[in-house]
């Protein structure tokens, strides 16, 4: 009896670790999101050539977040980060109407990869503070998210600079990855 209670207690309260891959087109706000979550502040960023990796502690969960550069020349490298990924954060610049089709194509190409078949998908519809930003429903439509019948996904409106929506997204991720474990 005592042993099973101890197991239950440790399962409920032990720190959980989750491997998260964050990708999206260049200038979507991935690095700003990563450091807003990690440091709680806005940092000056330059285009990511390669990757940034940080551990973000939130609600007894340790998220290892891999932020991979989004320039078209380095997108083929994304697949090298797929292994053991439990959650995929796809960041979209909600104000970039000219490249939303490109974002959709990259997302669907990635989701067809076998190594990501079990990963849950969180879409951050970023830059919601900009006046012409597409809302989450429009982004859902433009990315073709409703066609992802076999995928557990969620879209969260965010503003990386203020932090708005970021923790709601992490809550969804943690609940849905933990539910699959």
Curated annotation (Swiss-Prot):
Q: Which NCBIfam families match?
A: small_GTP (TIGR00231)
Function statement: GTP-binding protein involved in protein trafficking; may modulate vesicle budding and uncoating within the Golgi apparatus.
Which residues does the annotation say bind GTP? Answer: 24-31, 67-71, 126-129
* One BP term from GO: vesicle-mediated transport
Record PANTHER family? ADP RIBOSYLATION FACTOR-RELATED
Q: Covalent lipidation (N-myristoyl glycine) residues?
A: 2
This chain's source organism reads Arabidopsis thaliana (Mouse-ear cress)
Q: Which GO terms describe its cellular component?
A: Golgi apparatus; mitochondrion; plant-type vacuole; plasma membrane
According to its UniProt record, where is this protein located? Golgi apparatus
Supply the InterPro entries for this chain.
Arf1-5-like, P-loop_NTPase, Small_GTP-bd, Small_GTPase_ARF, Small_GTPase_ARF/SAR
Q: Which domain of life is it from?
A: Eukaryota
Q: Name one GO molecular function term.
A: phospholipase activator activity
Q: Which family does it belong to?
A: Belongs to the small GTPase superfamily. Arf family.
Q: Which keywords belong to this entry?
A: ER-Golgi transport, Golgi apparatus, GTP-binding, Lipoprotein, Myristate, Nucleotide-binding, Protein transport, Transport
Record flagged with keyword Iron-sulfur: no
Q: Which Pfam families match?
A: Arf
What is the regulation of this protein's activity? Activated by AGD10.
Q: Please give the name of this protein.
A: ADP-ribosylation factor 2-B
């Amino acid at each position: 009896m005592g042993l099973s209670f101890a197991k239950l207690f440790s399962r409920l309260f032990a720190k959980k670790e989750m491997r998260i891959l964050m990708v999206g087109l260049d200038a979507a706000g991935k690095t700003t999101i990563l450091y807003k979550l990690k440091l709680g502040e806005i940092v000056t960023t330059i285009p990511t050539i390669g990757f940034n990796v940080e551990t973000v502690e939130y609600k007894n969960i340790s998220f290892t977040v891999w932020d991979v550069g989004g320039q078209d020349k380095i997108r083929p490298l994304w697949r090298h980060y797929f292994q053991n990924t439990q959650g995929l954060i796809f960041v979209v610049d909600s104000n970039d109407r000219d490249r939303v089709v490109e974002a959709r194509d990259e997302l669907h190409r990635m989701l067809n990869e076998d190594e990501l078949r079990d990963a849950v998908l969180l879409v951050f519809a970023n830059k919601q503070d900009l006046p012409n930003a597409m809302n989450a429903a429009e982004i859902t439509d433009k990315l073709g998210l409703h066609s992802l019948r076999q995928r557990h996904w969620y879209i969260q409106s965010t503003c990386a600079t203020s932090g708005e929506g970021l923790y709601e997204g992490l809550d969804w991720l943690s609940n849905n990855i933990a539910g699959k474990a």
